[in-house]
Design a protein with these regions (language model features):
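Short hydrophobic helices that act as membrane-entry/anchoring signals
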Residues: 333-349
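Extended beta-solenoid/beta-helix repeat architectures
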Residues: 2-334
Length: 349
């Protein structure tokens, strides 16, 4: 049975009753004109076609379950999805600019060729698939304990990808023009970055404390700097990365980093480092800075030209060149990094 309503006839109470009817399998809102549309929590296991809905703000209530189709919609600017949403969302070729998901959502999200640049914030414990291709975003941010599969490919925007604490999912980045990628504390997920253009791409990746995951950056052709927080024990592959210049670890690194055949210039690890560094055939390597306790495992075929020391570190110099100023860090850099991470986690939506 099909039933048709005009915009004036489809009141909030009628929409509520419509979704409470479990015989309702699909709702299509063509030329539905309202400033704001609220999808009630009574929406259960139905499809909602809003491709031609003329509303500027869409609110999906918590605990609802629906397949939401916003493809080609040129009117919705803001989308807010409540906690514990189940289903799917497709906003390909739409003009949405702000998307915010609540906590505990389990849904698949797709966007192929966005109409406008957008910002997306995913709440805590998000799971599902996030697939964004050939689109422009200003910021994508996930919350705590995300275990989704995130695919970002051939996107642009020159902004940030911020992954929240305790990430347990997979992040695949392919040819994304973003300024920075930040990974939160206690990451145990899998991350891969690939680029096809050395002039455009991600320049800097910042990984917070407690990293125990896997990250493959061998094909990150524009990457220049990787910074890893304290107590990291994961695996980082930078073998053959031509653009990498500096890799820095805070205290107690016990993981493995493979830099063979890369363009790395400067490697630094702080106190308590017991990790393994593979530095074979690194022709540009200029300075290796390691703590005095000599617990690190270093694989390198070149002999340093000189070795300096201070109260806490050994400095292995492999040439006479001075380290570029942009690769060294002032003593307060780690505090600034922690402050920036705190602000992004708690204040930037």
């Amino acid at each position: 049975k099909e039933t048709y309503y005009t915009s004036s006839e489809l009141t909030a109470s009628r929409l509520e009753r419509l979704f409470k009817n479990y015989d309702t399998l699909a709702v299509t809102l063509n030329n539905f004109r309202k400033r704001k549309l609220i999808v009630p929590s009574s929406a259960k296991k139905c499809s909602l076609n809003l491709s031609h809905a003329i509303v500027s703000k869409l609110i999906v209530s918590r605990n609802s379950h629906a397949a939401i189709d916003l493809r080609d919609n040129r009117f919705v600017e803001t989308l807010i999805i409540g906690d514990s949403f189940r289903g799917s969302l497709n906003f390909s070729r739409s003009d949405i600019q702000n998307i915010k998901l609540g906590n505990n959502c389990r849904c698949d999200i797709f966007c192929i060729h966005s109409g406008k640049c957008f910002e997306m914030t995913l709440g805590d414990v998000y799971s599902g698939i996030l697939d964004v291709r050939d689109s422009c975003f200003h910021r994508i941010k996930t919350g705590y304990y995300c275990y989704a599969v995130i695919r970002l490919s051939e996107n642009w925007g020159k902004k940030d990808v911020i992954i929240g604490d305790s990430f347990r999912g997979s992040l695949f980045i392919d040819s994304v023009l973003a300024e920075n990628v930040e990974i939160g504390d206690d990451c145990r997920g899998r991350i891969s970055v690939r680029e096809h253009n050395r002039r455009q791409g991600i320049k800097h990746i910042d990984i917070a404390d407690g990293f125990k995951g896997e990250i493959d950056l061998a094909s990150a052709l524009a990457l220049q700097k990787v910074e890893v927080g304290a107590h990291a024990a994961g695996s980082i592959n930078l073998s053959g990365c031509p653009s990498i210049q500096a890799v820095k670890f805070e205290e107690d690194f016990s993981g493995r980093v493979d830099l063979r055949n890369s363009g790395v210039i400067y490697v630094r690890a702080k106190d308590g480092c017991s990790g393994r560094f593979v530095l074979l055939h690194c022709e540009n390597l200029s300075l290796l800075r390691l703590p005095r306790d000599k617990r690190a495992d270093i694989a390198v075929e070149r002999m340093p030209q000189s070795v300096g020391t201070d109260s806490r570190n050994f400095y292995y110099h492999f040439d006479e060149k001075e380290l570029p100023a942009e690769l060294s860090s002032p003593f307060y850099a780690s505090w600034v990094k922690k402050l920036r991470h705190f602000i992004h986690r708690h204040f930037i939506l």
